[in-house]
A protein has these predicted regions:
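Helix N-cap / beta->alpha transition motif
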Residues: 13, 50-54, 72
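N-terminal intrinsically disordered, cationic/polar leader segments
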Residues: 12, 19-22
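Short, intrinsically disordered, mixed-charge
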Residues: 22-30
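Short glycine-rich, low-complexity/disordered patches
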Residues: 30-40, 89-98
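Short, structured protein-protein interaction patches enriched in aromatics and acidic/basic residues
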Residues: 32-64
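Mixed-charge, glycine-accented linear interaction segment located at domain edges/termini
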Residues: 66-98
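Alpha-helix boundary/capping detector
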Residues: 2, 46, 50, 74-77
Length: 98
């Protein structure tokens, strides 16, 4: 994912990115702004990052693989629930499909 006019590149696994793209684009189509936050992988660095997602901020979804991953509806719903909460969108573990 590439965020903002400075082109900050954020490495996100293709499967997670596909789910995040659906949630983020749904909210942006509704002209909603929200916080997107995640904890860093310990192999990368300790800590966390938070981004303000707003329709006026450039956002580009870039995938490594050539195929779009299949979507897990339960995961999409869990991510959307998080995005609609006061704490904003946070990466949650993928649940089993119903």
């Amino acid at each position: 994912m590439i965020y903002g006019s400075q082109g900050a590149k954020i490495e996100i696994d293709d499967r997670l990115l596909a789910h995040l793209q659906l949630v983020i684009m749904t909210k942006l189509r509704r002209n909603e702004q929200f916080l997107f936050a995640w904890d860093h992988d310990e192999a990368y660095a300790r800590g966390h990052t938070a981004l303000w997602i707003n329709p006026s901020i450039p956002l580009h979804f870039q995938y490594v693989g050539s195929r779009r991953p299949a979507l897990n509806r339960a995961w999409t719903e869990a991510l959307m629930d998080a995005a609609n909460s006061a704490g904003g969108l946070r990466v949650v573990p993928e649940p089993a499909e119903h």
